[in-house]
Amino acid sequence: MPKRTDIKKIMVIGSGPIIIGQAAEFDYAGTQACLALKEEGYEVVLVNSNPATIMTDKEIADHVYIEPITLEFVSRILRKERPDALLPTLGGQTGLNMAMELSESGILDELNVELLGTKLSAIDQAEDRDLFKQLMEELEQPIPESEIVNTVEQAVAFAKRIGYPIIVRPAFTLGGTGGGMCDTEEELRQIAENGLKLSPVTQCLIEKSIAGFKEIEYEVMRDSADNAIVVCNMENFDPVGIHTGDSIVFAPSQTLSDYEYQMLRDASLKIIRALKIEGGCNVQLALDPHSFNYYVIEVNPRVSRSSALASKATGYPIAKLAAKIAVGLTLDEMKNPVTGTTYAEFEPALDYVVSKIPRWPFDKFEKGARELGTQMKATGEVMAIGRNIEESLLKAVRSLEIGAYHNELAELSHVSDLELTKKMVHAQDDRLFYLSEAIRRGYSIEELQSLTKIDLFFLDKLLHIIEIETALESHVDNVAVLKEAKQNGFSDRKIAALWGQTEQAIADFRRANQIVPVYKMVDTCAAEFESHTPYFYSTYEVENESNVSKKPSVLVLGSGPIRIGQGVEFDYATVHSVKAIQAAGYEAIIMNSNPETVSTDFSVSDKLYFEPLTLEDVMNVIDLENPIGVIVQFGGQTAINLAEPLTKQGVKILGTTIEDLDRAENRDLFEQALQELAIPQPPGDTATSAEEAVVIADRIGYPVLVRPSYVLGGRAMEIVENQKDLEDYMRHAVKASPEHPVLVDSYLLGQECEVDAICDGETVLIPGIMEHIERAGVHSGDSMAVYPPQYLSQEIQATIADYTKKLALGLNCVGMMNIQFVIHENRVYVIEVNPRASRTVPFLSKITGIPMAQVATKAILGEKLTDLGYQDGLYPESKQVHVKAPVFSFTKLQKVDTYLGPEMKSTGEVMGSDYYLEKALYKAFEASGLHLPSYGAVLFTIADETKEEALEIAKRFSAIGYSLVATEGTADFLAKHQLPVKKVTKISNPEGETVLDVIRNGNAQVVISTMDKNRSSANQDGFSIRREAVEHGIPLFTSLDTANAILKVLESRAFTTEAI
């Protein structure tokens, strides 16, 4: 059926900020969909609150609204734009839930807006646990025995009837939020209570556990003519019981017989047809390893994390085609853009193995609960492609950037057998490494299979890797064994360790013996038809399919997996850099390992290498392509860390040179540069031991900020108040040494702000100054940022601009740089300089209209800023006020303290813009999911040193009609100042109503909790209070500056009511 002509204007809903369970895959899907609709001639309106995405760039849609995805704001935009139709299936769970809410509010009927893609009834049938169960019964598709419950007691009664273990799955939540596996009644009560609270419809499905079955996924597409195909099927390495987003996954499936494959394929197609979904859909199934019995676990009636993986694994652009299906096109009418000859109804075939490994944030949250279950915890993922499982898996392991170049972690050699067994049975994020260690110790794969229920086939592949290790050890310098190791994904570094040689020696020996990788094309059809996609992976075979062009090329290094501290902002900068390289007439080549992002869409660059970002893998591409140089400024710390080793290999780094990068990162050189430029910085020094740190701190005075050198996202950074805490930090948080010194700085309390600048060696363009709402001490990525500055005097702004210019020219910066300042007692100090793109680039680019990464790339390639139409100094400010607010994923990460400090904890960001600061703040809070009631109770639990300041805030809350509740010390203090306050007891002293009861019973609408600097039981109480607030979805502020910002909003919305 040809595309519809009765609709002209379509609204697309994005997925909002990046959180665990909903990451960059929706930026990729949404960008593809908007462009596909524009290609077909429709007018596109986009609503998304996330400024860090390519999707919210002006050119992606005809009308781009960076506004909160809430009923209030989306309704307003619908009334203003009057679209004919709405496409919600590309905005993840956020988009689906918003569509349901809009429909229930009646506005879609009122404005006559049609829902495209998937009907509401289908969303309901797939998402509402009860309706889904009924549909499966009608289709005679088996589902685990289960019951829908609305209370904890109903859940307990069902469990008593069918026995434990059982699984709790809340309705309409994302990434398994609030769900979990229960072995006892006590666990069930706790998880069911939490799950019912987090489900927007207070409904959970309690089902018999089928943990241990094989977990299989099918990614399917259907059109309005009822054509349906399987794009890709995938098999989880981990059996049922671990969320698929936290599982290692292989595509295509590896252990299914043809009969099993066809049986599950038929079931998946039957389901998508019954739901009448038009577009993409993901079906998850559980297969009994000992029979042909299977169960349908769940269906996602939308584009998902798995469809991004399936798109990158096959090259088949699911989101693009789903958008076109939504407007009436059919699979047999659309060409597959990969081959350009076959039609989209042709099922992709793979002649390689794809593996995906999740990337977890536990390097940031050492105290976080690492056990994996049905609730997702990974922030991102990596993908690798190889000719066999071993090669694919080992390439994925080294893509993770966790310091592992092979499936082993050195520290596991000290673990006892008992501990090893425990960690394999109760899976954590590092189970793969424990399994490998067990095989090295001589456990049989049959033993491991009975402990973990992982298929013998996969365990045998791990065994094969370890057999090759043994062969390498006993055959040093043997070319045949070396070749076998390389064909199975071994890194030069691992072989070097086994042969007692250097990595360079192995690389030289390998090249001397003609053992070099070739690059194969990802073509969706297993080479059955000719195809010309510029999308490649490496393998050790004979024929190379990547032809080097005559045109000079530039290699851009991507930023790898999404993790805390290095998010989608860096992918945004990478994509823009590529556009500028192409515009300058060069061939742009991207290397990256993240399947979720826009940068790894093969249509973005001239050539895409889907490879790990390690020195060996990058050098292999450089050896083949011979680019004029490499750009490292846009790939975060991942790319910057490769600058020095690449330079040593004779590779040209474009932009700021490695010597100048080092002057910004190396403490002594940086101090020297600042002294020469006469720019002040907080007093401090470098310590190579704990004793030295104490001496420095005594000299400059407490509090001090301590951190290791060369970090991103403030890893292991702390503010320390006294000598005992400093010794404690030096012992536990860092291993100081002459090679890895620790920086000890005087901690200056003051207003913090930051600047992004672009320099071409002569002119310094400063797009804007961003002022942080939280004082120095909260990581810049976790602070709310305001542009243009609201409280900085013209004089201070001039000083900041002057220092920025001096630094950019003094450090010979070419390209981007980011500088953070603190204003202490009316003096400007430099805290740090990052000679690369920072996470604020997309935010500032959107509001100033300067495509910063493109302009910086042009400067890197030798163009002058004045020729591009830019002047020296600060760019004129915009009329509106823009607020960038962080978004956290604490509900998914148990046992993590939500207190904000110098170590970054947020996973995403939103933006609020308006002509008044208060309105922009309101939008930012709304967009970040903090919905503020206009009345209710505020719970205060305040550390002694901030009580005076908190008093002012309490007075203002009281003045606009809030009641005050506080823990003992705080309540006495407020009462002494004549404020009406209700006192509650501490946790450690449970007489009467405790502070936790107040939160649990819904008697606090806002919680303000500051941390006592001298760590005692007060802090343990504080931790419990903060966790309780997060788990009950109550707005929590750990900084009085943020509370002050909230008050501004509430006061601006409050009216005075007084009797005459």
Curated annotation (Swiss-Prot):
GO terms for cellular component: cytoplasm. Residues 1-401 are annotated as: Carboxyphosphate synthetic domain. Its cofactor is Mg(2+); Mn(2+). Mn(2+) 4 binds at E832, N834. Mg(2+) 4 binds at E832, N834. It catalyses: hydrogencarbonate + L-glutamine + 2 ATP + H2O = carbamoyl phosphate + L-glutamate + 2 ADP + phosphate + 2 H(+). Residues 930-1060 are annotated as: Allosteric domain. Mg(2+) 1 binds at Q284, E298. Disulfide bonds: none annotated. Residues 547-929 are annotated as: Carbamoyl phosphate synthetic domain. Residues 402-546 are annotated as: Oligomerization domain. NCBIfam families: CPSaseII_lrg, PRK05294.1, PRK12815.1. This is Carbamoyl phosphate synthase large chain. It comes from Enterococcus faecalis (strain ATCC 700802 / V583). The lineage of its organism: Bacteria, Bacillati, Bacillota, Bacilli, Lactobacillales. The gene is carB.
